[in-house]
């Protein structure tokens, strides 16, 4: 489970409507993914990634619920670019919540448990320092 999936779990009872959690990644980008719920379980439609808001909105083809701290930053731009396809979660559902992480964990299959040692961090893009070092070093 990742933070984006946990954010999608803020809205678990909406089935068959895509949920797009977005987190501000700075530099006019958002970390995002797209999930759909079926039978109370989140299914990944688009894997987590980092994109510009313009690139993300160009891929939105149906009504989609946006949730996450990126909504506060990019709401107007998303509304303009996605038009009627943009649906925004209520403010109290846009932040990460421990209860949503617990809900996401409860959806795991019975044999899908991980030990703490098996957990790993997933970085969707290199840090600014890494990118600048690569630019300097070719």
Regions found by a protein language model. Name each.
Residues 1-95, 123, 128:
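Surface "functional belts" at beta-alpha junctions
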Residues 89-138:
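Acyltransferase
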